[in-house]
């Protein structure tokens, strides 16, 4: 009896470490989850084929979305399940509780989640780099020193705000009200920045996609004054890129199921590459599956996104 129990215990431990149920992916609605688009589409399509093997094509998948030339031998539907979330708070709660294994979120949100999870959640890859740009109607070449005496509108006090202040400091431009420095006006969201710019209340706004595309679609006079990523590399060194969005996973997935984790990283990277090459296809998938993006501007916004997938140390 004891021998049988020991064998069963060893058997169960072996399979617990080597066989994992579906990886549960959380999709936080918005631009940051666009890199999951093709992974999600493949999973849904293959699930339909499993349920009805005689169906060779899915009627709901448009020609724009189909990509038979990039068909993979893997079957994502056997490995992944997906849940959608409206807010980071909802996603964080499920990840900490162990119901969600992985997600793509902003680097700012990731920092908060890692701290709140007490190490249960970790960052494992960069997905996109910052695409912040200062937009204006004013013509001519504009440098940081040209911003002195002006107001620059930003959303929140997160990554964009911090990087902007750092670049101003590196260029010896003071942050203060009046004619001697740059005044930073903080708004709650980038949607507010778009409104302020279009209503001509703001001469300079610091925005990223999809707000950037929204402005250019609605204002003929808008132009990029300063590309923050380019300036960041000028100051801190060529090739230095700050992640805008990152892939976060539960540590028990990364360390407890290394084979599945490695395959998952490869599948996500492939999905990111496809979104980069086929922004219209990614936009179509996102619009059909309620990723929380506006189809009117999402294809343009995806095309302007700086996809930059690379893995990172877990600690």
Regions found by a protein language model. Name each.
Residues 4-13:
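Sec-dependent N-terminal signal peptides
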Residues 16-21:
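Boundary at the C-terminal end of the N-terminal hydrophobic targeting segment
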Residues 22-185, 203-209, 225-226:
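Short, glycine-/small- and polar/acidic-enriched structural segments
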Residues 31, 217, 281-315:
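An extracytoplasmic/periplasmic, membrane-proximal ligand-sensing/linker region
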Residues 42, 170, 174, 218-221, ...:
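A short linear boundary/processing microfeature
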Residues 108, 117, 185, 189-285:
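Pocket-lining segment of extracytoplasmic ligand-binding domains
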Residues 146-149, 246, 306-307:
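Flexible glycine/proline-enriched surface loops and loop-helix/loop-strand junctions
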